[in-house]
Amino acid sequence: TRSGSVDPFIVDYLGKKRGMTVDETLYYLNKKCGFIGYCGYSDCRDIYRLIDEGDEKARLAMDVFGYQIRKIIGAYAAAMNGLDAIVFTGGIGENSADARNDICPGLEFLGAEFDAEASHDAPAARLRK
């Protein structure tokens, strides 16, 4: 539901353009953006169900999500002069093989090898080198 990384001046912009208070803007950014803003749902299970049904907005939500996560992983890899492992935590990271399958392809340039079968079958799936 959260907005992700946004320019901090969005608070001022929404206040002036939409007449929103700071509290309204913070509520909007934290409860009405992110997955909900793209497809109307915040739960990954619902979003992947919609994707299976052919919903383009749900597919876009997860494509953007995967892209943003890959950007963060790349930035961390650069800041730390490489990576030893990529570890998925939290509700989506630990419980959604679909999300891991959307995120990991494209990270091979880091030397990572993703095992989609292990990701699907194992509760603590791994991306290993």
Regions found by a protein language model. Give the residues of each.
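A mobile "lid/hinge" subdomain adjacent to the ATP/sugar-phosphate binding pocket shared
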Residues: 18-61
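Glycine-rich phosphate-binding loop of actin/hexokinase-like ATP-binding domains
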Residues: 1-16
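Internal helix-turn-beta structural module
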Residues: 59-83, 93-129
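Glycine-rich beta-alpha junction loops
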Residues: 5, 32-33, 92
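Buried hydrophobic packing segments
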Residues: 10-14, 47, 73, 103
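Short gly/pro-enriched beta-turn/loop segments at secondary-structure junctions
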Residues: 6, 42, 81-83
